[in-house]
Design a protein with these regions (language model features):
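C-terminal helix-coil-helix/basic helical segment that borders enzyme active sites and/or dimer interfaces
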Residues: 349-382, 398, 471-482, 486
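Extended, charge-enriched "interface" segments that sit outside catalytic cores
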Residues: 1-110, 129, 540-541
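C-terminal amphipathic alpha-helical interaction region
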Residues: 455-541
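Alpha-helix capping/hinge segments and adjacent helical runs
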Residues: 4-5, 11, 18, 22, ...
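Internal helix-loop-helix
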Residues: 80-171, 218-220, 424
Length: 541
């Protein structure tokens, strides 16, 4: 475009027509390796659709037009509803059509469905992350509800397993698709849910009356929430629907929406239960056990979502560097910039390898070893990857310079979104304490680690040295070292996957960069070329 004073040139065009799946070599390989190659064609199809300018614009619109709380109608009657921009509904429709909320729970689900679903989740998260909150809670709650749906709600099974998104304000049994939320956090407790004060009193018909509050109650428009409340038998889990069996609204009062740093598209609410009615799931006192069943899956999604946003930030950075010229050459050809981008790509390689090994473990959790692998590495992955996200996106911003620091850039939304996954579903220290709990109390965990690490022993001296260092720490795993132990465990999990499946030069480069505490590692030109080719589908060299 020509202006009076100058001609605009050397300004890269936006990245808005790419295939989010085929451009990610590490992801394509991981999906096939971990048992979901049968979904590759579908992933390529939705990867192309999600990478369009139209899809990306929906993500922008949903965030610049946040949800609005509707407490009352014009006549003063309680509504307790939330109004969303149309872009939100289109994003949710796509997620449900692609079965990100229930793929693994279908009656005829194929082996590897958890892996395929993880890949679909990752692609959608690169477009808009807030809409993944209702999806991940629904995904985690569905298997529990398929076993424990209270008798008055047996007609919910079909819409729970449908591929439809239905935003109508109707009883769940009358809808084509359902969303399920969770209500745990209270003002005084946060992660300490045992201090919850919401009370539940058993009624004659077997239901319970709930009185109390929740301080962070995301997706208040859900058709039901799984809510923790105190009973005579201890902290318990309740199915609290939006509509009662007689068609009346339940007494769930929406007080205000949270004004959050990021996650702007998604509604998070403060609520009060004024004699709300709920149905007990399991037995009184089993609330923590039931919530933990779902918590592992939501924590995995937190790690996966942060990784996906890191991947999007990297894509924006390398695309910019490929087009932008400095000092007579493309930015991608400048040695220092090329090295920075290569190290970012290398970090993503290791994370992808571990996350999709984790997805396979979740897929095969009926096997005791796989279940233990998921139990140990899920909180470790959430702790490390969600922590890494913020500086990673900041690095991508630096690649773009000032244009990456302006509201027109996707990177600002990614940066604001990053902290939430470190906080939700248990903050960093909670994850590390959980890892220590598994290491101290789960039978067979040390045999599991030994088996995983012995399999690649002798292939890389940095890896072997790091294993010995972790073994020393685990002789007496002190709580104060929880973060260091968790971080080291995560790195070794990534390293084992890289040594097992990546090319030897790339695996050794990963181990040296990530495990050599001395630093100062220079990646060879060949490794840089390989990394950048894999990270762009062969576009940027």
């Amino acid at each position: 475009m020509h202006w009076q004073t100058h001609t605009v040139f050397n300004q890269p065009i936006p990245l808005n027509n790419s295939n989010l799946y085929l451009s990610d070599g590490a992801l394509c390989e991981a999906v096939t390796r971990e048992g979901a190659g049968w979904d590759s064609d579908f992933l390529a199809s939705i990867g192309q659709q999600l990478g369009t300018a139209e899809s990306l614009e929906l993500g922008r619109l949903a965030n610049v037009n946040p949800p609005e709380l509707l407490r009352y109608d014009a006549q003063g009657r309680r509504l307790d509803d939330v109004r969303f921009h149309p872009a939100w509904h289109l994003l949710m429709q796509a997620l449900c059509t692609n079965r990100v909320h229930n793929l693994a729970w279908e009656e005829d689900a194929r082996s590897g469905a958890f892996v395929a679903r993880a890949a679909r989740f990752m692609l959608h998260a690169q477009v808009e992350a807030g809409s993944l909150c209702p999806i991940t809670m629904t995904f985690a709650a569905t298997p529990l509800l398929l076993q424990m749906l209270p008798a008055p709600f047996q007609d919910w099974t079909t819409p729970l397993l449908s591929d439809r998104y239905d935003s109508h304000l109707l009883p769940g049994g009358q809808k084509r698709g359902l969303l399920i939320g969770m209500g745990m956090t209270e003002k005084q407790g946060g992660s300490d849910v045992m201090s919850n004060t919401t009370r539940a009193e058993r009624l004659e018909d077997g239901s319970y009356r709930l009185v109390g509050h929740k301080w962070f109650f995301s997706v208040p428009q859900s058709d039901a929430h799984l809510v923790l409340a105190q009973t005579a038998g201890g902290l318990s889990c309740f199915f609290v629907p939006r509509f009662l069996p007689d068609g009346q609204r339940n007494a769930i009062r929406l007080e205000r929406l949270k004004d959050k740093l990021g996650n702007r598209s998604n509604a998070s609410c403060e609520v009060e239960f004024q004699d709300a009615i709920g149905w007990l799931l399991g037995q009184e006192g089993e609330g923590i056990r039931l919530i933990l069943k779902m918590g592992g899956m939501t924590r995995f999604d937190c790690a996966l979502g942060s990784h996906a946003m890191m991947r999007r930030a990297f894509s924006l950075a390398i695309y910019h560097a490929h087009q932008r010229h400095v000092f007579g050459n493309p930015l991608i050809q400048q040695p220092l910039m090329r090295h920075v981008l290569s190290r970012m790509a290398l970090q993503l390689e290791g994370q992808t390898a571990l996350l999709f090994r984790l997805a396979r473990a979740w897929d095969r959790r009926a096997d005791a070893k796989e279940a233990l692998w998921a139990r140990l590495f899920t909180p470790a992955a959430k702790f490390v990857i969600c922590k890494r996200g913020m500086p990673f996106v900041a690095e991508a911003m630096e690649v773009l310079g000032g244009i990456g620091y302006c509201e027109e850039s996707e990177l600002l939304r990614l940066y604001r979104e990053m902290p939430v996954n470190s906080i939700w579903e248990g903050s960093g220290n909670i994850m590390c304490l959980d890892v220590l709990r598994v290491l101290n109390k789960q039978a067979g965990v040390y045999d599991l680690l030994s088996e995983a690490f012995v399999e690649v022993k002798g292939q890389d001296r940095y890896f072997d040295r790091a294993v010995r260092r972790l073994q020393q720490q685990l002789r007496k795993p002190a709580e104060e070292l929880g973060r260091e132990i968790t971080h080291q465990l995560f790195l070794l999990g990534c390293g084992a996957q890289m040594l097992k499946y990546a090319s030897p030069p790339m695996a050794q480069a990963w181990c040296q960069v990530m495990l050599d505490t001395r630093g100062g590692v220079r990646l060879s030109e060949q490794i840089q070329n390989d990394l950048l080719l894999r990270a762009t589908g062969g576009v940027c060299v």
